[in-house]
Every structure is written in C-alpha cells, then in structure tokens.
Regions:
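Active-site loop-to-helix "anion-binding N-cap" substructures in soluble metabolic enzymes
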Residues: 1-244
Length: 244
C-alpha cells in the first residue's frame, strides 16, 4: 500500500474549492486499493471535510493529533474515543515535530499510539531529527530513541502503524533534504524495526512538493509522503498524487 497524507495544520480552507481543484487536476491516479490519500484538516473542519468528500473516489479523512488521555477534565484536548465517533476517520498523525516542540515526549507519543489502536484508528507516527542533531552526527541515536518505545509493543505487528520520517530542519522551508540523506535515515529506521521483527510502511515528510516528490518516491523503502504546505493547494496536491 502507498500513502499520500496531507497535513493542513492550523489553516482553514474552502473545502469545496479545494476538492474541486484536486479532482479536476488529478487525472488518472491509483485507486484506494493501492493508494490511500488522506486529508487531515484542523479539528473544526473535519466534519465539513467528511461531508464534502463523501462522494470522492479518492479522498479519506484523518486527524492531525489526538490526546493521550481518556475523556475527562482535560481542557482543549480531543480523545481517541471522540475521533472514533467519526467512522470516516481511519488515520491520525502523532508525534509531529510541532507537537513534540510543544511538549510531546516519546512516552506521550507512544501513549497516543496505543489509544488510537484501541479505537482501530491507524497512527501515523512521526520521527525525525533537528538540524542541530543532524550536524552533531547523533542522528541515528536520536532516531533510535524515538523508535525504542515501540520495540516491545505487541500490537505493532498486527495493526497498521505507519512511520513518517520528517527532516525537521526542512519543514516549511521549501527546501527538501538531499536524497542521499533521506535514504540513509529511512534505511536506518527500516533496519532498526527489522531487528524487532517489525514491518511498517515508512513515509517521508519535509518540504515535499510536486517537483521533488517523484524523485523521493523512487526510493525503494519509501511508501509514501506526508505533505504540509504543498497540500494546501488542491492543484499542487493533485500533481503530487500523479507521481505515485
């Protein structure tokens, strides 16, 4: 299975206009059986996206984040049980670098993953290093620690957990990491998971656009893309979808 996941972040879009631009420009792309195209709007727009995309033959709905807590006195948070009330939500991003900077630890990301699996929602677990970590030569150790908490997770093998490798220092800059650097990290992640007999699809995220996506997707161990800024334009996102 291949994956193309849009993270709209804290942006509010004209959903009808976005869907129209996407579907008018996507041409012949793979079906849902081989390519899952998942759109993650902000929480308030999720119901509207579900409604407007109901008749789309390509688009699925996801969430940008979830709480590690069960429903209760946690102001401003959304639980996995709340997400599961929308049967159309099949995926949820956790551990995005912007959430990690806001305080999500590896332990919290693991807890969020568990909550999602309990509700049969597939977690898209983000891992990745900062520019400082990359330049210090500590990238592999840093990635290992992010993956370490999942090593004894018995449900990992029987549930659809997706890993998204994001080069934090490239996010939002318009400049993607060099292919050789992406390859090294993806191969390391795959090898690390393999030592635990864990198989997971691995995506790449970090200033992905229609121009660079084809070259990135040519890498054998990359099963898809997590797209930020370029996903806000339905036409641009359609061009990325055509590269699968």
């Amino acid at each position: 299975m291949k994956y193309l996941i849009a993270n709209w972040k804290m942006n509010s879009l004209d959903i009808s206009d976005w869907i129209s631009k996407f579907e008018n420009n996507c041409g012949e792309i793979s079906s849902k059986e081989t390519l899952q195209i998942v759109i993650c709007p902000n929480f308030l727009q999720i119901p509207f996206f579900i409604e407007k995309s109901a008749f789309s033959k390509y688009l699925l709905t996801g969430s940008q984040d979830v709480s590690e807590k069960d429903p209760g006195p946690f102001t401003g948070q959304v639980s996995s049980k709340h997400l599961s009330n929308f049967s159309e939500i099949h995926y949820c991003i956790v551990g995005h670098s912007e959430q990690r900077m806001a305080g999500d630890t590896n332990s919290i990301v693991f807890q969020k993953t568990q909550k999602l699996i309990n509700e049969k929602i597939s977690p898209v677990v983000c891992v990745g290093e900062s520019l400082e970590t990359k330049e210090s030569g500590d990238r592999e150790n840093f990635l290992f620690k992010q993956l370490e908490s999942f090593s004894n997770f018995e449900n990992f093998k029987s549930n659809s957990i997706i890993i998204a490798y994001e080069t934090i220092w490239a996010i939002g800059t318009g400049i993607s990491a060099e292919i050789s650097s992406i390859r090294e990290s993806i191969d390391f992640i795959k090898a690390t998971l393999a030592t635990k007999n864990i198989q997971s699809e691995i995506l790449y995220g970090g200033s992905v656009n229609a121009t660079n996506s084809k070259e990135i997707l040519a890498e054998k161990n990359i099963s898809g893309l997590l797209v930020g800024n370029a996903s806000l334009d339905g036409e641009e996102f359609a061009k990325i979808a055509q590269n699968f």
